[in-house]
Amino acid sequence: PISNEIPLDQAAVIEPLAVGYHAYVRSGAQEGDVALVGGGGPIGLLLSAVLKAKGITVIMTELSAKRKEKAKESGVADYILDPSEVDLAEEVMKITGDKGVDVAFECTSVNKVLDSLVELTKPAGVVVIVSIWSHPATVNVHSVVMKELDVRGTIAYVNNHKETIKLVEEGKIDLEPFITQRIKLDDLVSEGFERLIHNNESAVKIIVNPNLK
């Protein structure tokens, strides 16, 4: 159950937050680790919020200006790197003291991102594939073998809501920044679906409130 201390509109964000929490659990990441999150969409942002709450340093990679701004506003990442503007490998190695990251999360379904994560994860590190791919992907198996990487999949959540809710109740995660719009039920199609279809780079969670006037 969700306590009365969490507003109902924020409670609606618990479900996608639990997706991020489950990915964190699958990774085995520990406090003090450095994580590389590939992609700053809704799941990438919420996953990063969980990682930060768990004392993990977060490096996020993202190309979209709007998504970079949302990551900055919500404070979920310690570093936000745009591969089109900087040398990603050089910057990550600088941050990690040439060691590579402890764990990496793929949240884009883009093969180039997956390749970067495999390249920049340290030996014996973990790469977690969070996004659902609708097309075949390739992975540099030679790098996986030579660095003894663990490549893991994760899907949705498995009995993670209790721990996820606790993070919010304890004030370790503020869900308000992830509510990008509140709309009336009558505006579900004209404002909700239209924004998700045509301007989804700026949308994280759109709340439909039948009581709005």
Residue ranges and their predicted role:
Residues N4-E85:
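Mid-domain Rossmann-like dinucleotide-binding core that forms the NAD(H)/NADP(H) cofactor-binding site
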Residues D115-E119, V158, K162-K213:
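C-terminal hydrophobic helical "lid"/dimerization subdomain
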Residues S27-A29, I59, E69, S74-D150, ...:
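Glycine-rich cofactor phosphate-binding loops and adjacent beta1-alpha1 units
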Residues E15, T108, A156-N159, I183:
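Residue-level signal for the nucleotide or nucleotide-sugar donor/cofactor binding architecture
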Residues I2, G20, L51, A71, ...:
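Residue-level signal for nonpolar/aromatic packing positions in well-ordered secondary structure
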Residues E62, S131, I155:
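Conserved acidic E/D residue at the C-terminus of a beta-strand in Rossmann-like folds
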Residues S3-D9, D174-I179:
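Short glycine/proline- and acidic residue-enriched helix-loop micro-motifs
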